[in-house]
């Protein structure tokens, strides 16, 4: 419930500000947007970090749009059509992600604690949004290096995911050996090494077969569903969503 409430208010804030930019009432500059909309009703339910990153994301989306539009005017052949301005967020399909910075993140007794606004604390009678971290997660993430946490809903499965962004030191490569990978289909990959006579072929036929099964089954179920409701009202069923997830994760 807490996550859905946060998602609702950050999505609504995103849409309100996006509408004002579309109408020419505001320029997509983060500092100006934050100054004007920080007292919006929806902001009462969002921690300052949630609000700020919602507006930063929108400003960045508009910046990318204008960059693409300028490039389109110079190189129209690179595009299938005129770039479109940032779309609105819909709670049932693409709700806005909820972002917490390191200043709103704490680790205590193996739990990830995310700061909430006073309004949310009072509404849900909690001090923070808490997630228990498994030993496995704690083993490969340096908790002191966490920079950001995102809560995002995946469109195919409609599941919510916790995304932890952290700094990690890159190990220096002391060797000069080189590996060459040649992707294929029947042979998924052919691998050779500069300083070795060993070569490897990875069989891709099982993967092709499994992928073909998923595609065929998804097409069959989609055809049945379209006959039931019509193509205009067609939506992925739970079974089709499950198959898409299985195909992606296979």
Segments the model singles out, each with a brief description of its role:
Residues 1-250:
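Nucleic-acid substrate recognition interfaces
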